[in-house]
């Protein structure tokens, strides 16, 4: 479909009246169920979308939004869609598959989205990914999408990447829940929850990611390469095979690198629990910095580690390692690292790391010089005294928010409460 509405008077395509959402089901060999192409001021809402083939097919998706040789596509809105059972490829290099695929390109006319929104959708049992883009990534010909908002969506039973904006400037990813990820990806595959690629000024906040089981990575959040000024804040990560966050840069990529990432006021409980070897051996650091990332700030995050279920599971709180280079000028400030078992910080050959005022609550090997660091906190001990796992005892840090179709509850970090928590930690 293609349609051109006007600002304030969009073309609306969706259900009306009462009853169940109308269901659109693709033919067996279709790459998409719904295609929105070269449109302006269009809203697609209140529909059920299915694309299940007899066999898996690479690049299969539920809803595809395309802007091609069109210029600027304004205010496309996907709202309250239930997209499910899309059996794409599980392998990224073969094309993968997704619930929603957003594509902007143009041989003759650079084409972008301005004001695209995806909100209140449910994406369930879609393979490989949830919401993913294909946009301009080459910095020499970078035409970013603007005013992108992805808000209050439920992504569940999706094994791969949850939400991945590509080629955007100023994307806002907030109040989304990714959970119940099946461990069905092949051993070669890497994936994580919410992360940008080839983007600037992305804000990822007030989201919750749990149960990620990708064979490699599997963090709740990721500040990826060819990105500048990514902010990951006020998020809740728990029960992921990987840790809270990956911050990475390929040292051989000619793009923008990874500059100015900020990771702050996030809560991680029982992450980094991978019970099997990755393609590089046993590994599941709570914070993983890979490659020559520059000027990263990791500030006031709460990492509450629970006992590992097997002795061979990785116990690294922080690992900074190589990806054709090492990180430089990373600051860790006033974070809480709670560990019930011996753990480790591995900085390897990364340079100019600064640790200032962090809390090392437990036996942590490789602790760096931190003149303002602390080894004990009576306040934190009181917080978790009735529930050492942290799940109930730290629940005061969260609000509950209804998202998706109204049946899912998101735990969103409360901004004021977590600020008070860290001030209390500092003042005791």
Predicted regions and their residues:
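Short, recurring structural edge motifs at helix starts
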Residues: 67, 105-108, 138-139, 193, ...
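Right-handed parallel beta-helix
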Residues: 10, 14-19, 40-51, 72-87, ...
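Extracellular beta-strand-rich solenoid/capping regions of secreted or surface-exposed proteins
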Residues: 1-12, 23-74, 93-109
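Short glycine/acidic-rich loop motifs that flank beta-strands on beta-rich extracellular proteins
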Residues: 26-33, 53-61, 87-98, 127-133, ...
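Acidic, glycine- and Ser/Thr-rich low-complexity intrinsically disordered tracts
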Residues: 12, 296, 306-308, 322-428
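Short, solvent-exposed loop/turn elements at domain surfaces
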Residues: 21-23, 411
């Amino acid at each position: 479909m293609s349609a051109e509405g006007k600002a304030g008077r969009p073309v609306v395509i969706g259900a009306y009246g009462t009853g169940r959402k109308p269901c659109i089901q693709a033919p067996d060999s279709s790459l998409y169920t719904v295609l929105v192409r070269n449109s302006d001021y269009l809203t697609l809402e209140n529909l059920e979308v299915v694309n299940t083939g007899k066999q898996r097919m690479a690049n299969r998706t539920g809803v595809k939004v395309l802007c091609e040789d069109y210029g600027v596509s304004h205010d496309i809105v996907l709202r309250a869609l239930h997209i499910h059972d899309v059996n794409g490829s599980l392998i990224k290099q073969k094309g993968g598959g997704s619930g929603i695929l957003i594509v902007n390109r143009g041989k003759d006319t650079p084409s972008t989205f301005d004001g695209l929104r995806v909100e209140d959708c449910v994406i369930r049992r879609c393979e490989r990914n949830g919401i993913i883009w294909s946009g301009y990534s080459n910095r020499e010909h970078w035409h970013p999408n603007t005013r992108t908002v992805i808000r209050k969506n439920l992504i569940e039973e999706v094994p791969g990447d949850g939400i991945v904006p590509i080629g955007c400037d100023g994307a806002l990813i907030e109040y989304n829940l990714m959970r119940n990820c099946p461990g069905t990806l092949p051993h070669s595959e890497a994936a994580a929850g919410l992360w940008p690629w080839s983007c600037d000024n992305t804000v990822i906040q007030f989201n919750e990611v749990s149960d990620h089981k990708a064979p490699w990575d599997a963090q709740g959040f990721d500040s990826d390469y060819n990105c500048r000024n990514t902010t990951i804040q006020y998020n809740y990560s728990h029960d992921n095979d990987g840790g809270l966050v990956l911050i990475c840069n390929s040292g051989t990529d000619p793009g923008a690198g990874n500059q100015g990432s900020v990771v702050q006021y996030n809560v991680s409980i029982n992450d980094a629990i991978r019970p099997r070897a990755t393609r590089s051996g046993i590994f599941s650091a709570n914070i993983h910095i890979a490659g020559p990332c520059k000027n990263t700030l990791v500030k006031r995050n709460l990492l509450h580690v629970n006992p590992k279920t097997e002795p061979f599971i990785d116990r690294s709180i922080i690992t900074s390692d190589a990806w054709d280079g090492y990180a430089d000028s990373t600051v860790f400030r006033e974070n809480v690292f709670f560990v019930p078992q011996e753990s480790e910080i591995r900085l390897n050959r990364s340079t100019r790391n600064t640790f200032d005022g962090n809390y090392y609550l437990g036996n942590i090997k490789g602790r760096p010089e931190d003149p303002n660091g602390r080894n004990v906190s009576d306040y934190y001990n009181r917080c978790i005294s009735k529930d050492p796992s942290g799940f109930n005892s730290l629940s005061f840090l969260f609000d509950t928010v209804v998202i998706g179709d109204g049946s899912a509850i998101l735990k969103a970090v409360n901004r004021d409460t977590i600020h008070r928590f860290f001030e209390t930690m500092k003042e005791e």
